[in-house]
């Protein structure tokens, strides 16, 4: 299940540069992190959902690529983003 519109708007407001900033790397990373966290709770109860697990791995890979890009282009924004999201790195 995807995120609700209100939850997405709250994430964009928190991580975006303005209210309509949906394309910046940090917003995309935050949205993917919220979806990944939601899917992890889904897999706690639905252990045999292998099709959904493939989608989860795809999201994790996409987030990793965005994090690598952000680290390469803006190191201080990268460190603040992973600290705010609670990601290890």
UniProtKB/Swiss-Prot annotation:
GO terms for cellular component: cytosolic small ribosomal subunit. SUPFAM superfamilies: S15/NS1 RNA-binding domain. Keywords: Ribonucleoprotein, Ribosomal protein, RNA-binding, rRNA-binding. InterPro entries: Ribosomal_uS15, Ribosomal_uS15_bac-type, uS15_NS1_RNA-bd_sf. The keyword RNA-binding applies. Belongs to the universal ribosomal protein uS15 family. This is Small ribosomal subunit protein uS15. The lineage of its organism: Bacteria, Pseudomonadati, Pseudomonadota, Gammaproteobacteria, Pasteurellales.
């Amino acid at each position: 299940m995807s995120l609700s519109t209100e939850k997405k708007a709250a994430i964009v407001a928190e991580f975006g540069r303005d209210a309509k900033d949906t394309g910046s790397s940090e917003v995309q990373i935050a949205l993917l992190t919220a979806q990944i966290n939601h899917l992890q709770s889904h897999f706690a109860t639905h252990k045999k959902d292998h099709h959904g697990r493939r989608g989860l791995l795809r999201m994790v890979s996409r987030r990793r690529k965005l994090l690598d890009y952000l680290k390469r282009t803006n190191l201080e924004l990268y460190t603040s983003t992973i600290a705010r999201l609670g990601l290890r790195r």
